[in-house]
Amino acid sequence: NPASMKSSLDVLAYADTRKVAILGDMGELGADELAMHREVGAYAAFKNTDVLVCIGALSKDMAEAAKETVLATEKNMKVFHFDTKEDFYQNMGQILKENDTILVKASHFMEFPEIVKKLSEEA
């Protein structure tokens, strides 16, 4: 849910290294789901996240809101959107750097533990 995502971004903000948030769709939000995804995207920019990777159909709105916030506030955050985890895997070598602090979070149905496993294998 959005509160959990924001709390996780709050914790990530304390990292001394480059901050990367890999976020996915949040499920079961009802009629406000697009607005809630946008809210999280904007929040990531305000929390000085260095890189935001959004994965999933609903997370496209998260990425768009983050990009809009970056432009409006002149924040220095890179934003990426991928439709699938597999699309992200093909690009993660160009996005992630050694010593990044990485937050991985999404609703359970997105099966993001797979991403954590993939990151561990690549480390």
Model regions and ranges:
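ATP-dependent carboxylate-amine ligase
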Residues: 1-123
